[in-house]
């Protein structure tokens, strides 16, 4: 029995496809809790900030900017969580500001007693994999918790 399953989500359809696999785990036996995690990387729009006239500073309220991203993440996770309501599955949501999603995911898993991480992978190979990197692959290599990778092919059912 898994006591706590961590499901990192990035807002993509592929990431949400993992939810079907999590629900299947419940069919095979009881699971204590599912944690839906969104690691929010807040990128400051430097290009837009530098678009002002020469010599004029553009005011930027980082806290308001961050709050917008974090609120958007919380609303997104609440919508995803609602899909589990009829299943009788205990679900918790976490929105965490992140400099690197893979590290945030592995740190959260280690600090919070996670038994399994279920994460989607884009399935890139070759040059595309080298250029784009893979959060899922980094999680797989950095985590001391078992990781279930869900490839795109597993979503086309």
What are these regions (language model features)?
Residues 4, 13, 107-157:
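Gly/Ser-rich helix-loop-strand patches that form or flank binding pockets
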Residues 39-41, 98, 152:
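Active-site loop/turn elements of alpha/beta-hydrolase fold enzymes
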Residues 33, 90-92, 146:
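Conserved beta-strand segments of alpha/beta enzyme cores
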């Amino acid at each position: 029995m898994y006591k706590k399953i961590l499901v990192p989500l990035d807002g993509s359809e592929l990431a949400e496809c993992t939810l079907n696999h999590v629900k299947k785990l419940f069919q095979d036996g009881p699971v204590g809790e599912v944690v839906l995690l969104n690691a929010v990387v807040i990128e400051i729009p430097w290009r837009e900030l530098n678009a002002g006239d020469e010599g004029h500073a553009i005011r930027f309220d980082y806290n308001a900017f961050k709050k917008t991203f974090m609120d958007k993440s919380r609303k997104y996770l609440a919508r995803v969580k609602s899909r589990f309501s009829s299943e009788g599955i205990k679900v918790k949501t976490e929105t965490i500001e992140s400099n690197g999603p893979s590290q945030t995911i592995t740190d959260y898993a280690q600090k919070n007693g996670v038994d399994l991480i279920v994460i989607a992978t884009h399935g890139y190979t070759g040059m595309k994999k080298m250029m784009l990197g893979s959060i899922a692959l980094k999680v797989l290599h950095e985590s001391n918790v078992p990781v279930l990778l869900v490839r795109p092919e597993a979503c086309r059912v």
